[in-house]
Amino acid sequence: MRVLIVKTSSMGDVLHTLPALTDAQQAIPGIKFDWVVEEGFAQIPSWHAAVERVIPVAIRRWRKAWFSAPIKAERKAFREALQAENYDAVIDAQGLVKSAALVTRLAHGVKHGMDWQTAREPLASLFYNRKHHIAKQQHAVERTRELFAKSLGYSKPQTQGDYAIAQHFLTNLPTDAGEYAVFLHATTRDDKHWPEEHWRELIGLLADSGIRIKLPWGAPHEEERAKRLAEGFAYVEVLPKMSLEGVARVLAGAKFVVSVDTGLSHLTAALDRPNITVYGPTDPGLIGGYGKNQMVCRAPRENLINLNSQAVLEKLSSL
């Protein structure tokens, strides 16, 4: 059986889809998946053993110059790649009009998705042949697991979902695996940042632990923040710029991780690493870290200024 997945973004949403593949792989021997995903996240599906082909899409980039000759050529090549296979099922796990119209509609196969009442954007359901009612008040991982089970005709397991990507990195862990922590300090929204003075206080509190701390970054302003956090601490390392796979390898070898609400926090969960995620205004209930050893540290009054380093240290002691 060959199935196409349409789940293009974001990083957390893409990662939250992986346990559904594991369920299907266990329920339907020999099943294989192709996966349409935004080019920036194209490495992620390849880490799962059930994925045979990754089809990158670049809607975010294309829309800036949709009708230019180079972009038209890219869109044509994408359409040809998408339509090269006749699928037993096409599962749109994105639930948005944009992806349904520009991707799902063009694929060959019976199209499954959430119904008008439960899709993220109800109009997206008009593009599906089979519409499934998936209750909203459950974690995003469980919603996707239920969608796959109903689309492919098996019962959703009652056990916790398994991302099944940690093993991809086990044969290539860093030589110092287990000897360091990773602090994920960067996120997209200002109100989801933990103040730098709190990060530095936590780093100072770990001075006698013997653990080294690694700080990844993606953009130049994040590198500058990492340097400020590391200043004066010999046991803190600002990492070089890395690919997503490179960062995943570092996370896979971490003894533990402390993170803000960011896509890399979900990657940590997918890699089964102990993780404390600090939350301010966002509610982790339905979209927070899902997996083994994932702990939430909520800020008083939903403001991360009010979350001190001692509270995070106390959580660390319980990992």
UniProtKB/Swiss-Prot annotation:
It is found in: Cell inner membrane. It comes from the Bacteria. Pathway: Bacterial outer membrane biogenesis; LPS core biosynthesis. It comes from Escherichia coli (strain K12). It catalyses: an alpha-Kdo-(2->4)-alpha-Kdo-(2->6)-lipid A + ADP-L-glycero-beta-D-manno-heptose = an L-alpha-D-Hep-(1->5)-[alpha-Kdo-(2->4)]-alpha-Kdo-(2->6)-lipid A + ADP + H(+); alpha-Kdo-(2->4)-alpha-Kdo-(2->6)-lipid A (E. coli) + ADP-L-glycero-beta-D-manno-heptose = L-alpha-D-Hep-(1->5)-[alpha-Kdo-(2->4)]-alpha-Kdo-(2->6)-lipid A (E. coli) + ADP + H(+). The keyword Membrane applies. Its EC number is 2.4.99.23. ADP-L-glycero-beta-D-manno-heptose binds at residues 187-188, 192, 222, 242, 261-263, 266. GO terms for molecular function: ADP-heptose-lipopolysaccharide heptosyltransferase activity; lipopolysaccharide heptosyltransferase activity. Optimum pH is 7.5. Active between pH 7.5 and 8.5. CDD domains: GT9_LPS_heptosyltransferase. Disruption phenotype: Disruption of the gene affects LPS biosynthesis. Deletion mutant synthesizes shorter LPS without the outer-core oligosaccharide and cannot produce flagella, demonstrating that flagella assembly in E.coli depends on the length of LPS. Gene3D superfamilies: Glycogen Phosphorylase B. Coiled coil: none annotated. The gene is waaC. One of its GO terms (biological process) is lipopolysaccharide core region biosynthetic process. It is a peripheral membrane protein. Signal peptide: none annotated. Glycosyltransferase involved in the biosynthesis of the core oligosaccharide region of lipopolysaccharide (LPS). Catalyzes the addition of the first heptose unit to one 3-deoxy-D-manno-octulosonic acid (Kdo) residue of the Kdo2-lipid A module. The analog ADP-mannose can serve as an alternative donor in place of ADP-L-glycero-D-manno-heptose for the glycosylation of Kdo2-lipid A. Displays no activity with ADP-glucose, GDP-mannose, UDP-glucose or UDP-galactose. GO terms for cellular component: cytosol; plasma membrane. Its main location: membrane. PANTHER family: LIPOPOLYSACCHARIDE HEPTOSYLTRANSFERASE 1, TETRAACYLDISACCHARIDE 4'-KINASE-RELATED. Belongs to the glycosyltransferase 9 family. The keyword Glycosyltransferase applies. This is Lipopolysaccharide heptosyltransferase 1. Keywords: Cell inner membrane, Cell membrane, Glycosyltransferase, Lipopolysaccharide biosynthesis, Membrane, Transferase.
